[in-house]
């Protein structure tokens, strides 16, 4: 299956989860094993050898764990605050109406492991910037960030580039 055919299975849901938002529903793509595999392989071809693929909760997990298997790499989750059982470090990021926080185990990236960070969407850049900060504080060497969608009009790429100018950002779809 061609990547464009796989991506065509993603449907737009207007006004979800609130008015003015165009939500990208990936469930039809995930339900089709050929399409899902095509997307995972497309991500994997963009990534050189790496120790760890790190995914951001929640939809980033769906892609990151599968990419990690494809690349014979470990998987590390960035979780919402309070969801990890061991000692963690956290980073806050801004939301439209307040703040949220993601965490990672304090030993997730020990010994300067090379890391690729994966999420479903790059919008404002807040969540990915928080993940990059945590990886940096943990001693990881971040090679790149990979997303399924990039919403270019929201400035996320620029936010990340300002704080992390040497981190490459790759997206399969840009709108």
List the predicted regions and their residue ranges.
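PRPP-associated nucleotide enzymes
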Residues: 1-175
